[in-house]
Curated annotation (Swiss-Prot):
Protein's recorded name: Sugar fermentation stimulation protein homolog
GO molecular function, one term: DNA binding
Similarity field: Belongs to the SfsA family.
Pfam families in UniProt: SfsA, SfsA_N
Length: 237
């Protein structure tokens, strides 16, 4: 996935009100970025470190700049725009870069499914084969070289696991795909200490036949590419 134009860089001052971040530009002036991440961004916020942002030409936007990448204290890049996760997953599947999800000829987004008024991130179809329901999760919480999910208690994430189990029970393929947007993450696990209910439900889902995949990104100021398989460990978080 290429950005419409190379990202611009700045230095982070602070993030506040969840959706805003103040930064210092290269010319020394300050501006406010839109922060497209509603999570805690635990271990992703490093005041004084570099960030990268895209710029919209939409005159109706209050904040023209969108925060895309951050840098941690070890120089790792972090993709903080959670909306990119679904885009990356769809592109990678369409290009055949996720081997476990090859062989489907149709990809649909945001299709209603399940018993709890949900919409699936991606629904794959191929002839007479069972449909494949995919929930996509962005993983950026780093603990040593582990990526943990979620970074806060997630009742929504718990609901999605229940929905995936129901789809599997009905005979479909059900997949949880972690899109790892942090260069320092080399293994993924549920965040047991943060959301033990989610961790337990995830193990229950695996036992019920839900598949779990994790893939990492190549990233720079020109774009992102999801193509690096990462091991998942259901009991290690």
């Amino acid at each position: 996935m290429e950005y419409p134009a190379p990202l611009s860089s700045a230095v982070l001052i602070t993030r506040y009100k969840r959706f805003l971040a103040d930064v210092t530009l290269e010319d020394g002036s300050q501006t406010t970025l839109h922060c497209p991440n509603t999570g805690s961004m635990k271990n992703c916020l490093y005041p004084g470190k570099r960030v990268w942002f895209s710029t919209s030409d939409n005159p109706k936007r209050k904040y023209a700049h969108t925060w895309e990448l951050a840098e941690d204290d070890r120089g790792n890049l972090i993709g903080i725009n959670t909306a990119r996760a679904n885009q990356l997953a769809e592109e990678a599947i369409g290009l055949g870069q996720i081997s476990e999800l090859q062989g489907y000829n149709q990809i649909r987004r945001e299709v209603k499914y399940g018993n709890e008024n949900s919409r699936i991130d991606l629904l794959l179809s191929e002839g007479q084969a069972p449909d494949c329901y995919i929930e996509v999760k962005s993983c950026t919480l780093l603990d040593h070289d582990w990526g943990l999910f979620p970074d806060a208690v997630s009742t929504r994430g718990q609901k999605h696991l229940r929905e995936l189990m129901e789809m599997k029970r009905q005979g479909y393929r059900a997949v949880l795909l972690f899109v790892v947007q942090h260069q320092g993450i080399h293994r993924v696990a549920p965040a047991e200490a943060i959301d033990p209910k989610y961790a337990a439900l995830l193990r229950e889902a695996i036992a019920a036949g839900v598949e779990v995949l994790a893939y990492g990104c190549m990233m720079n100021n020109k774009g992102l590419q999801l193509n690096i398989p990462i091991p998942f460990h259901p009991d290690a978080g």
